[in-house]
């Protein structure tokens, strides 16, 4: 069974490598840099899923991203809202990554991107606008805090997309001692979402995706 899954993943990966984008060279450059410098960016599977959700939900115009990294996921999402006069607000705590993302955004053909440098646990509260889509991919131990603060800004019918919710698989297999607190918080966060929200799903895509819709 595991061998079949591996073969299936390799097949899927070969297909989604045929990615089309006006910023294709830049995207490839960011992917290469992330691999060399060990920068955490979204997987190709998540990239495709994000694109699909945003592309097919025409009401998504304003997006909040918690965790910019070097701008990879921001570019992917922003491309899908350009013809809607949409806007991306993206928060990053690391100054070096913030600057790299800034450079990457400037190299792209994209408009309507607002970067914020700071701790999302503080910066989200300062935002005075609402969003149709929220993407969370930052410090795993703070996921519940990020969610609670940003959900207040989510428009009716909006979606929260939480990436890496399975945290390298440590939620269902033995984890190193240094990760025990994060694993416990993530496990409790998943229970919290299922207990308090009706439109919730947990999907085994890449390192796990949690979706919450505001109905």
Where are these regions (language model features)?
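A short alpha-helical cap/connector motif
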Residues: 1-133, 140-161, 165-215
